[in-house]
Swiss-Prot record:
Disulfide bonds: none annotated. Plays a role in the cleavage of a residual cap structure following the degradation of mRNAs by the 3'->5' exosome-mediated mRNA decay pathway. Stress-induced regulatory protein that modulates the m7GpppX diphosphatase activity of DCS1. The lineage of its organism: Eukaryota, Fungi, Dikarya, Ascomycota, Saccharomycotina. The keyword tRNA processing does not apply. InterPro entries: DcpS/DCS2, Histidine_triad_CS, HIT-like_sf, Scavenger_mRNA_decap_enz_N. It comes from Saccharomyces cerevisiae (strain ATCC 204508 / S288c) (Baker's yeast). This is Inactive diphosphatase DCS2. GO terms for molecular function: enzyme inhibitor activity; hydrolase activity; protein heterodimerization activity; protein homodimerization activity; RNA 7-methylguanosine cap binding.
Length: 353
């Protein structure tokens, strides 16, 4: 838990500028300051409550909601319309605007996230940016990415992860925890990701953080990890449906890894397949299904992903772009014979031979 109250912090938030506004995901991110320190405030409109997916308190006292079907609720989309204005109509089509009944527990308007104090790394991650496709070779990983990972894995930067794993932070949100000091390798904790409002099962987004600390990212995986990943995948797809009373089934879960990850301690994302996005909204690289990783480790060779070239999207605000990826992409395009940024008026060169 943070040392200060969220409402108090937001009350002291001083607006500076809009970092990003996404009409598709219905998310806005603001840069500001609180008590003279940078802060990033993000608001995301919550998913609709509808009559067949209604939140009810858990009888067992679980920290996460339980969902039942075919129940009528006063805050559902249909019953919650309090005001309606028709914009226009044409034949069988009608358009309008509405106001829905809101309640902080049953039907909140938006999910709010605050990062404070926010570092330049956080700010750049949320800011609008141009994106590029990068082909990361093993040499690029060794010469550019590895030093960057070392910078990002200081005890101070990873403190929040260790707080979750060992200090009881966010225990009230934990969905599942498995840990034994005698078998640290198989231990992991599952809890809601900050992308989930914790209310609607259609937008379910969880993260499983492992206890073992010898794997920073996808790159560290090799065939020796294959059986471990198979066990992890099986446990996730068994535990999560049971926890939510099978309102989400095993084959409705997208279990995947990010590369580049947002932090370099191995973790797995667990998302309802109805969720519209899988984390690439801010140019965060690529996603690869855990089952595809498991299959690939069967034929990649003894060094696994360490010897594979990985192609993904990266934003110009990412430190890796500035630490050498920009120059490497330019070299690759030149090597491939692909022209970039022709001067205006030079015409289109059709000679591709």
């Amino acid at each position: 838990m943070g040392s200060q109250d969220l409402a108090s912090l937001i009350g002291r938030f001083k607006y500076v500028r809009v970092l990003d506004s996404n009409p598709h995901t219905k998310v806005i991110s603001l840069l500001g300051s609180i008590d003279g320190k940078d802060a990033v405030l993000t608001a995301e409109k919550t998913h609709f409550i509808f009559d067949e997916t209604v939140r009810r308190p858990s009888q067992s006292g679980r920290s996460t909601p339980i969902f039942f079907h075919r129940e009528i609720d006063e805050y559902s989309f249909l019953n919650g319309i309090t005001d309606l204005k028709e914009l226009t109509s044409n034949d069988i089509y009608y358009w309008g605007l509405s106001v829905l009944k809101q309640h902080i527990l049953h039907n909140p308007t938006a999910k709010v996230n605050l990062i404070w104090p926010a570092s330049q790394f956080h700010i750049k991650g949320y800011d609008q940016q141009d994106l590029h496709v990068v082909r990361e070779t093993p040499d690029m990983y060794r010469n550019i990415v590895v030093p960057f990972i070392q910078e990002m894995c200081t005890s101070e930067r990873m403190k929040w992860v260790n707080n979750i794993l060992y200090e009881g932070a966010e225990d009230d949100r934990v969905v599942y925890k498995e840990y034994s000091s005698r078998n640290k390798e198989d231990g992991f904790v599952i809890l809601p990701d900050m992308k989930w409002d914790g209310i609607n099962i259609d937008s379910l987004y969880l993260v499983a953080i492992v206890y073992r600390d010898d794997i920073k990212s996808l790159r560290d995986l090799n065939p020796n990890h294959r059986d471990w990943l198979i066990r992890l995948n099986k446990k996730i797809k068994t535990i999560i449906p049971q926890h939510y009373d099978y309102n989400v089934n095993p084959d409705e879960l997208r279990v995947f890894i990010h590369y580049q990850p947002s932090y370099y301690h191995f973790h797995v994302h667990i998302v309802n397949i109805r969720h519209p996005g899988v984390g690439e909204e801010r140019g965060s690289g690529m996603t690869i299904l855990l089952e595809d990783v498991i299959e690939a480790l069967g034929f990649l060779g003894p060094e696994g992903y360490m010897k594979k070239t990985l192609t993904y999207v990266i934003g110009e605000n990412h430190d890796l772009w500035k630490k050498g990826f920009k120059e490497e992409v330019e070299k690759q395009l030149k090597h491939d014979g692909i022209a970039t940024s022709p001067e205006k008026g030079s015409g289109f060169n059709t000679n591709l031979g």
